[in-house]
Amino acid sequence: MYMLGSLCKEAVAQSLMSKLGCSSVMQVPKVVKVCLNMGIGIGAMDSKVMDSCSRDLALISAQKPVVTRARRSIAGFKIRKGFPIGCMVTLRGKKMYEFLDRLINIALPRERDFKGLSMSQFDGHGNISFGVKEHISFLEVDYDKIDKVRGFDVSVVTTAKSDYDAKALLTELGFPFVN
């Protein structure tokens, strides 16, 4: 299942060296980390909802998520400072490549109305962020044990200097792009 990591070090690096005009393998952009964030909002006050979301994110990422808390009180949203509002995971190394492999080959093709990623989802510094609408598109999540279908955010951080370089890297890895 760890095919994407070895592919990245061998074939992708050689291909990107010729495409981007890099003189050394060390200049080739790489994926540094993948951050997954599941915001629950006001529902996080219920411990059952929080446990369910944390369990689902742990199944998807194969790593225990950390609970995110509100930084300040917002009366309009009825939250106070320190209230749990979601959970997040940062993946690096082998687990990161395993997750990306499952995301590219299994989850994104199963996503409803998914046409591909667009250039507007890049941040200008070579990183891309997008949302997964249904967490049940991952095979690890048992459909019978979930209480509600939730989505989560995925941020892929790379060492690329520009969005063009990052798109070239992610295209070589197999990410589907619209244009």
UniProtKB/Swiss-Prot annotation:
Keywords, comma-separated and alphabetical: Ribonucleoprotein, Ribosomal protein, RNA-binding, rRNA-binding, tRNA-binding
Gene Ontology cellular-component terms listed: ribonucleoprotein complex; ribosome
Organism domain of life: Bacteria
Gene Ontology MF terms in the entry: rRNA binding; structural constituent of ribosome; tRNA binding
GO biological process: translation
Segments traversing the membrane: none
UniProt keyword Metal-binding, yes or no: no
InterPro entries, A to Z: Ribosomal_uL5, Ribosomal_uL5_bac-type, Ribosomal_uL5_C, Ribosomal_uL5_dom_sf, Ribosomal_uL5_N
Record text on subunit structure and interactions: Part of the 50S ribosomal subunit; part of the 5S rRNA/L5/L18/L25 subcomplex. Contacts the 5S rRNA and the P site tRNA. Forms a bridge to the 30S subunit in the 70S ribosome.
Family matches, as NCBIfam families: PRK00010.1
Family membership noted in the UniProt record: Belongs to the universal ribosomal protein uL5 family.
Summary of the function given for this chain in its UniProt record: This is one of the proteins that bind and probably mediate the attachment of the 5S RNA into the large ribosomal subunit, where it forms part of the central protuberance. In the 70S ribosome it contacts protein S13 of the 30S subunit (bridge B1b), connecting the 2 subunits; this bridge is implicated in subunit movement. Contacts the P site tRNA; the 5S rRNA and some of its associated proteins might help stabilize positioning of ribosome-bound tRNAs.
Name of the protein in its database record: Large ribosomal subunit protein uL5
Organism expressing this protein natively: Anaplasma marginale (strain Florida)
The encoding gene: rplE
